[in-house]
From Swiss-Prot:
Keyword flag Ribonucleoprotein: yes
Name under which the protein is recorded: Large ribosomal subunit protein mL50
Higher taxonomy: Eukaryota, Metazoa, Chordata, Craniata, Vertebrata
Top-level division of the source organism's lineage: Eukaryota
Subunit structure: Component of the mitochondrial ribosome large subunit (39S) which comprises a 16S rRNA and about 50 distinct proteins.
Length: 159
């Protein structure tokens, strides 16, 4: 096929000559030439996570005596300076507010709410009830060893 094809069109008695290009030449005009892509160097900034994953085994936790005042002051930081009289009935429907509250309490008290209990934290009262329960770092077998056993019963770990 030739590079140029001359077509003759008869229009109103005139003879027109139009140069027609090949398909490749026709479509190459509309294509934009691709510019080489230059990769920019981006400096990575590493941020420390807000809440570090707790260890696999739970640590012992004893609720502090001033737990209610700590919780109230932390809620004031998260929600604002003024709290209603029934601040324990405040709903935790907002996910961001719930996260800030629980993350701050986990850092301050050293005891995090496990993932399996997060859906149960609907109100501030639920959070207060969770943090009022002491946690022991012993298994049932450790408690049996430490308890006063009868002389005919002995637990040996190495067998």
């Amino acid at each position: 096929m030739a590079a140029l094809i001359v077509s003759r069109l008869a229009r109103r008695g005139w003879l027109w000559k139009l140069p027609l290009a090949t398909r490749r030449e026709f479509w190459s005009r509309s294509r934009k030439e691709k510019e080489p892509v230059v990769a920019e160097t981006v400096e990575e900034v590493k941020k420390e996570p807000v809440l570090v994953c707790p260890p696999l085994r739970s640590r012992a936790y004893t609720p502090p005596s001033d737990l209610q005042s700590r919780l109230e002051s932390h809620i004031k930081e998260v929600l604002g300076s003024s709290l209603p009289n029934n601040w324990q009935d405040i709903s935790l429907d907002d996910g961001h507010m719930k996260f800030r509250l629980l993350a701050g309490l986990a850092d301050g008290l050293g005891h995090a709410v496990p993932n399996s209990r997060l859906h149960q934290m609907c109100r501030v009262r639920d959070v207060l009830d969770f943090y009022n329960v002491p946690v022991q770092d012993k298994s049932k077998f450790d408690e049996l060893v430490a308890s006063n056993l009868p002389p005919n019963l002995k637990i040996s770990w190495s067998y």
